[in-house]
Amino acid sequence: MNNQPVVSIIIPFLNPGHWLTEAIESVLAQTYTSFEIILIDDGSVEEDAAIALKYCRRFPGKVFYYMHESHVNKGLTASRNLGLAKARGALIAFLDADDCWMPAKLTEQLGLFETMPEVQMICEASLFWYSWNDPEKENNIVQIGVPSGVYTPPQLIKLLYPFGEGQPPCPTGIIIKREVIDRCGGFEESFSGIYQLYEDQAFLFKIYSTEIIYISNQANNLYRKREDSMSSSANNLEVYNTVRKFYANWVEGYLAKIPDHNPIIDTLLTAFKKSLVYAETQPGITL
């Protein structure tokens, strides 16, 4: 690209151990080099903070380390928001500390922005990474649940989980223009504790509501699958349904603050709330 915008890559971490090294190294290996890495320490042990600080010393002006006041644990949403507050780039990307990128990830996504300037966010498929723990287990690419292409608001609310049936994007596969976050706001910090399960869905809802988005079938990110991850808690039916109710209430409150929102979204919310009521009457059912 002739004019290379800076990409701010936000990596929150809480005791990831050597995975943090793998995540950072995967960014440093990118073929697109106009980026900054923002490491947000969410109350990690000293050894993991030392990993982050080591990279800051090795790459001054390229890698940055921040922590919450008094080094407290504030959760993923607050950590991502701290990263957003420190970011200087025109583009924002997210990488969880236990995931990795393939070398062409940024190059391919920046190329898409260049050819489609109207697009405000790009979401790509993810490689679900099982072989990190079991070399005999096959990895598989999980596509986002709609065909590759450009989507206008609020199409993706209807088509993708949790209001629709399609597989949602992983945050690790997303890149977004900073100006969009300035318009729509960052991550919702009320989605903490068990509700963190839907923190990315709340963020995406705001973007889906108002912005033009490109869905890519490329997969340049490795989403590490492990049993103790936050997404695994969705297997707990009671927790899962509690979180979904919380999300529905949040959506209702959010829409109330935007009187000129698309009325199609109200129809989708009503159907979603009805599905929650139905799930309560059918033991073992999740919708």
Feature-to-residue mapping (PLM):
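Conserved nucleotide-sugar donor-binding catalytic segment
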Residues: 85, 143-239, 243
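A structural helix-start
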Residues: 13-21, 41, 45, 102-103
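Acidic donor-binding segment of Leloir-type glycosyltransferases
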Residues: 25-69
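Conserved donor NDP-sugar-binding/catalytic core segment of glycosyltransferases
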Residues: 104-143
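The conserved acidic donor/metal-binding loop of glycosyltransferases
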Residues: 96-100, 125
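Glycine-rich, basic loop-to-helix element that forms the pyrophosphate-binding segment
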Residues: 69-87
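Short aromatic/hydrophobic "clamp" motif used to bind/position activated sugar donors
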Residues: 92
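N-proximal low-complexity "stem/linker" segments adjacent to membrane-targeting elements
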Residues: 1-28
